[in-house]
Regions:
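A conserved regulatory-domain signal marking ACT and ACT-like small-molecule sensing domains
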Residues: 1-187
Length: 187
């Protein structure tokens, strides 16, 4: 019987990390279904949804410390039950810019209050090329539940912009399902 698990990996970034982890999983007959990886200042973080026969996933759990040691990573494996996709309207992309990191808390508080799920989140901090001020940037992929009006959300975010001196951009995300395929040859 197939089972699913979530594997997280943390360690020093290096060339070949993704291949080494994929090879270790393939050798144990474990499939990678979904994954995210990022490198931050020389450190690497991976989160991987895996699938395999229950015995193979159990074996992976038993060998986790040895695999992690050989890769130079701290590994953690958690069995998961697949949940239904978040129900909601078409996804939105939110970008927010702030002179201080506390602005993001105000944005996420609005999203939480409205029952909006953050599907993907990235933040960055960078210095302005013409001043020494640090600007914080947040990018989030959102799923808005049917109970939340996008117009109401937009109004609330505009009010937050003015009150907290933020810059917030909210736009729909085009899906591949809404775009017709582009022919590559004559008809």
């Amino acid at each position: 019987m197939k089972t699913h698990a979530l594997l997280s990996a943390l360690g020093r970034d290096r060339v070949g990390v993704a291949d080494d982890l994929a090879e270790a999983l393939a050798a144990r007959k474990i499939d990678i279904e979904h994954s995210r990886m990022t490198a931050l200042h020389g450190q690497c973080a991976l989160i991987v949804q895996v699938r395999g026969e229950r015995a193979h996933v159990t074996s992976l759990q038993d060998e986790l410390a040895a695999i992690g040691s050989s890769l130079g990573f701290h590994l953690q494996l958690e069995p998961i039950a697949l949940a239904r996709a978040t129900q909601g309207q078409p996804q939105l992309m939110l970008e927010a810019f702030s002179r201080g990191p506390s602005g993001f808390n105000a944005v996420t508080a609005v999203l939480k209050k409205r029952g909006i799920n953050i599907e993907d989140l990235e933040t960055d901090a960078y210095s302005s090329s013409w001043t020494s001020a640090i600007t914080f940037q947040m990018r989030a992929l959102l799923t808005v539940p049917p109970t939340c009006s996008v117009d109401t959300l937009t109004t609330e975010l505009h009010d937050l912009e003015r009150a907290r001196k933020l810059e917030i951009v909210l736009k729909p995300v085009a899906t591949t399902a809404s775009k017709p395929p582009v022919p590559t040859s004559g008809i």
